[in-house]
């Protein structure tokens, strides 16, 4: 089958932003103008197409990344048809995992900002994630019709707070109630959209006299930014003082693809102004899969190899999301980097080392689905029938094996106990939690060995609330939920602590014998770079002369690794520890894997107790935005919560207070901040680092366990 859309006309893009920037409304307008929806859904009505989960429609926030495909031929229909695969990502900090895995498979992004609120805490988090994956992006300053809208100030904030190099492509005509349209700096014409046609009809007009000077200056800045792309363009610009429209676009595109500049558009998605021109910008300025560097991976022998975005290359794809669909079961969302895949084909999972057959391939439109026969390089689709795939797995041609770089997901920072309300809920709950954990790598489930309770862990209170809510709605499981608990960690402060343990049992017949001598130390920065570090723990075997036979070394390491999952201090995971196996002995008859495993575990527990063990608590980076009147109260409250103030900034919506606060002090903070400021302040927090808990806090936590 011939490819319907050439790969250079593909755009795999994400719509990214903080909460309330109008991201989902912007996505809805894209669907409307591209002809996918014949009626617009509004977030505040709970009718947005991209927000398809019940909780999303109720809460008015996007939780999971909905994927959809649309086609665009330009605002004036003059361009060849381009295919946009769009992912709408959540803006709440508890769901940054969704943003992270979307960015991993996208080629470009549209960064939606609120013209009133400007750059918010979540904007910074998302920006850092986009930098990590070197994603070219452009900005859309939305809500230009709102009271307090200020385009220039937002552009300034992009520079000051995100370290970006923004290049405005437009100048707004008016603001707030007087927002009429935009000036296109390429054509030096004003664009006015017709309200009666919901923005589908537009016209070019002359630039209003009072804005000619401002537009000329902005255009000169844009042309200069384009000229800096190459020496050839710069020479032409210096000699002629101007560049042609095509040359400007060429220069800007080149610099956008290198993530040197951020082209900035503006409008009001709600008032149907500006999204249309921004879509033209996606075609002109964001990359196709063929413009991105070939994706890197490792072959069977561990050598580095690359996949070019071409149909003629062997098939390779990355599974970036697993979802449970009520009608078809498990859906695996994947991005094809190279080659072609037909429904019914076999794929090789190079992470699990397994072959699987792809049943059906679906093109997703939010939670609607169309069955398709094949996918090609650059496509994003969902597969039905893959049984043993998890997020981050590579799917490839079994004759050309490659493992693409895996995604690294953050460790959960908050836990709570859940128990089924009735016996019939018991079995269903296990299945539901298993499915949800498969979908979301930042959500973990475990059973507390002592109490037998099921413990769920995630990235924040809202994250776990929604998990419990989904259990009830999608799996019909009613559960009681305990209080949120902090995910503490344990470590040591003393170095080179020796621990000698001999496990001996003799009770007639074959006995048990295992003897190990270990040295325990905190991991240094050099240790952290050691190739054998796994999960913040380093095991080094220094046995010589066969005092412990080789076959018992692996059980010793296994015994240590099992022990560190529940530390001796208070049962929390142990981190940042190095263990050297330095000596031991064995018995020809009585030694076994189990005996050495037990000896290693006991040696570690004894050594850990002597190595000055400490409890670590998660510290959150908190940003509070508030009117100035409440600053004193808020700062006093931060101090009472053992917070450390990091400084203040000005924002378009008030003062910004930055602080580091222990997670244990942040439960219920939303309610307390609301009552302190009459609901006028907002906050966002994300995990920053672990640090030693004060003795009184550590004692309380240890006594509870």
From Swiss-Prot:
UniProt GO BP: ribosome disassembly
Localization: Cytoplasm
GO MF annotations in UniProt: GTP binding; GTPase activity; guanosine tetraphosphate binding; translation elongation factor activity
UniProt-listed Gene3D superfamilies: 3.30.230.10, 3.30.70.240, Elongation Factor G (Translational Gtpase), domain 3, P-loop containing nucleotide triphosphate hydrolases, Translation factors
Keywords recorded for this protein, A-Z: Cytoplasm, Elongation factor, GTP-binding, Nucleotide-binding, Protein biosynthesis
Binding, GTP: 17-24, 88-92, 142-145
Residue span(s) of domain tr-type G: 8-290
Chief location category: cytoplasm
Domain of life, source organism: Bacteria
InterPro entries: EFG_II, EFG_III, EFG_III/V, EFG_IV, EFG_V, EFG_V-like, EFTu-like_2, G_TR_CS
An example Gene Ontology CC term for this record: cytoplasm
Similarity field: Belongs to the TRAFAC class translation factor GTPase superfamily. Classic translation factor GTPase family. EF-G/EF-2 subfamily.
PANTHER family on file: RIBOSOME-RELEASING FACTOR 2, MITOCHONDRIAL, TRANSLATION ELONGATION FACTOR G-RELATED
Function comment: Catalyzes the GTP-dependent ribosomal translocation step during translation elongation. During this step, the ribosome changes from the pre-translocational (PRE) to the post-translocational (POST) state as the newly formed A-site-bound peptidyl-tRNA and P-site-bound deacylated tRNA move to the P and E sites, respectively. Catalyzes the coordinated movement of the two tRNA molecules, the mRNA and conformational changes in the ribosome.
HAMAP family from the UniProt entry: EF_G_EF_2_B (MF_00054_B)
Name used for this protein in its record: Elongation factor G
């Amino acid at each position: 089958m011939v490819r319907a859309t050439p790969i250079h006309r593909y755009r795999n893009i994400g719509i990214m932003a903080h909460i309330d920037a109008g991201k989902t409304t912007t996505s809805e307008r894209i669907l409307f103008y591209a002809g996918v929806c014949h009626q617009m859904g509004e977030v505040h009505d709970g009718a947005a197409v991209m927000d398809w989960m019940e909780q999303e429609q109720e809460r008015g926030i996007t939780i999971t990344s909905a994927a959809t495909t649309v086609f665009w031929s330009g605002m004036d229909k003059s361009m060849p048809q381009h295919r946009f695969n769009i992912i709408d990502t959540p803006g709440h900090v508890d769901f940054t995992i969704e943003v992270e895995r979307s960015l991993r498979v996208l080629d470009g992004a549209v960064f939606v900002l609120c013209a009133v609120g400007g750059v918010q805490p979540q904007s910074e988090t998302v920006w850092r994630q986009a930098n990590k994956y070197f994603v070219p992006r452009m900005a859309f300053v939305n809500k230009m019709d709102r009271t307090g809208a200020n385009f220039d100030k937002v552009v300034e904030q992009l520079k000051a707070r995100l370290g970006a190099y923004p290049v405005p492509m437009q100048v707004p005509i008016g603001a707030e109630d007087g927002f009429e349209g935009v000036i296109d700096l390429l054509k030096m014409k004003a664009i006015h959209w017709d309200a009666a046609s919901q923005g589908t009809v537009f016209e070019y007009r002359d630039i209003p006299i009072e804005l000619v000077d401002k537009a000329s200056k902005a255009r000169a800045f844009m042309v200069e930014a384009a000229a800096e792309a190459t020496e050839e363009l710069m020479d032409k610009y210096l000699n002629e003082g101007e560049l042609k429209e095509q040359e400007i676009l060429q220069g800007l595109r080149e610099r956008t693809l290198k993530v040197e500049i951020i082209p900035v558009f503006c409008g009001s998605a709600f008032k149907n102004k500006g999204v249309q021109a921004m879509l033209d910008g996606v075609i002109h300025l964001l990359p196709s899969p063929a413009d991105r560097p070939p994706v890197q991976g490792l072959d069977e022998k561990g050598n580095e190899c690359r996949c070019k975005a071409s149909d003629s290359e062997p098939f390779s794809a990355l599974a970036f999301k697993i979802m449970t669909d009520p009608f078809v079961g498990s859906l695996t969302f994947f991005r094809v980097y190279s080659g072609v895949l037909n429904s019914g084909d076999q794929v090789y999972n190079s992470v699990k080392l397994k072959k699987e057959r792809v049943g059906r391939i679906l093109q997703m439109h939010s939670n609607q689905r169309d069955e398709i026969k094949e996918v090609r390089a650059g496509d994003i689709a969902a597969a039905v029938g893959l049984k043993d795939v998890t997020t981050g797995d590579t799917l490839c041609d079994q004759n050309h094996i490659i493992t693409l770089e895996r995604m690294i997901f953050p460790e959960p920072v908050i836990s709570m106990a859940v128990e089924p309300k009735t016996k019939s809920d018991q079995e269903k709950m296990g299945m539901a939690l298993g499915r949800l954990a498969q979908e979301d790598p930042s959500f973990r489930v475990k059973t507390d060995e002592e109490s037998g309770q099921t413990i769920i862990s995630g990235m924040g209170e809202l994250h776990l609330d929604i998990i419990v809510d989904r259990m009830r709605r999608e799996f019909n499981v009613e559960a009681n939920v305990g209080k949120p608990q902090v995910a503490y960690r344990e470590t040591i402060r003393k170095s080179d602590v020796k621990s000698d343990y001999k496990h001996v049992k003799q009770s007639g017949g074959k006995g048990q014998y295992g003897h190990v001598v270990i040295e325990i130390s905190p991991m240094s920065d050099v240790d952290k770079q050691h190739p054998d570090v796994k999960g913040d723990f380093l095991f080094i075997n220094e046995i010589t002369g066969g005092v412990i036979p080789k076959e018992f070394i692996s059980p010793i390491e296994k015994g240590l690794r099992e022990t560190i999952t529940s530390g001796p201090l208070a049962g929390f995971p142990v981190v940042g520890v190095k263990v050297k196996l330095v000596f031991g002995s064995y018995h020809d008859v009585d030694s076994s894997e189990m005996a050495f495993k037990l000896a290693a575990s006991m040696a570690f527990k004894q050594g850990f107790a002597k190595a000055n063990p400490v409890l670590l608590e998660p510290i959150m980076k908190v940003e509070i935005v508030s009117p100035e009147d409440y600053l004193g109260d808020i700062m006093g409250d931060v101090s009472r919560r053992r917070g450390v103030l990091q400084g203040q900034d000005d924002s378009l919506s008030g003062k910004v207070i930055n602080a580091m606060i222990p997670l244990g002090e942040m439960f219920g903070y939303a309610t307390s901040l609301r009552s302190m400021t009459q609901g006028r302040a907002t906050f966002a927090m994300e995990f920053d680092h672990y640090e030693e808990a004060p003795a009184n806090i550590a004692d309380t936590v240890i006594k509870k366990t």
